[in-house]
Design a protein with these regions (language model features):
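Short, Lys/Arg-enriched N-terminal segment that forms or immediately precedes the first helix
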Residues: 1-15
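N-terminal helix-turn-helix DNA-binding core of bacterial DNA-binding proteins
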Residues: 14-54
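Short, charged/polar surface micro-motifs in flexible loops or helix N-caps
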Residues: 32-35, 64-65, 89
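Alpha-helical residues within the helix-turn-helix
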Residues: 41, 63-64
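Short, hydrophobic-biased segments on the C-terminal half of alpha helices
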Residues: 56-61
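Beta-hairpin "wing" of winged helix-turn-helix
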Residues: 65-79, 84
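Basic, amphipathic "hinge/linker" alpha-helix immediately C-terminal to the N-terminal HTH DNA-binding motif
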Residues: 79-97
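Amphipathic alpha-helical dimerization/coiled-coil segments
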Residues: 91-115
Length: 115
C-alpha cells in the first residue's frame, strides 16, 4: 500500500471515528450555555478541533432533533445565538456517555487482552 493511500485511508477512518465523538463532545460542553465561537474555542482548548463548517450544521441538526435549545441575544453590541442542552439532550447525553464507557471498556479489553 502506497504512503499516500495509507495516509488517505487513515484520514478517512479518523474522520469517521471523530464524527460520533464530536456529537458527544458538543452535547457534553453544552451542559453549560455557549455561543458558537466560545464552544469552538473551549473544545479546541480541550484538544478537540472542529471547523465552523462542521460545528454550525451540527448545532442546527441537534436543535432540530430536540437535543438543544437556542436563543438570540445581544452581547457587546453583537447578536449571538446561545445554545444549551434541552431536557431531552441531557437524557440522551447520559445514555451516550454510558454507551461510550461500555465501548471504551470493551475496546480496552480487546486492545490490551493480557492486562
Amino acid at each position: 500500500m502506497s504512503a499516500d493511500l495509507n495516509s488517505d485511508l487513515f484520514n478517512n477512518l479518523r474522520l469517521e471515528l471523530r464524527r460520533g465523538l464530536l456529537i458527544v463532545a458538543v452535547l457534553a460542553q453544552l451542559r453549560r450555555e455557549h455561543y458558537g465561537y466560545t464552544l469552538r474555542k473551549d473544545l479546541a482548548a480541550l484538544g478537540i478541533e472542529i471547523d465552523e463548517g462542521t460545528l454550525y450544521p451540527l448545532l442546527r441538526r441537534l436543535e432540530t432533533q430536540g437535543l438543544l435549545e437556542s436563543e438570540w441575544r445581544e452581547e457587546n453590541n453583537r447578536r449571538k445565538r446561545f445554545y444549551k442542552l434541552s431536557r431531552a439532550g441531557r437524557a440522551i447525553l447520559k445514555q451516550l456517555l454510558a454507551e461510550l464507557e461500555q465501548i471504551n471498556s470493551s475496546l480496552t479489553r480487546i486492545i490490551q487482552p493480557n492486562e
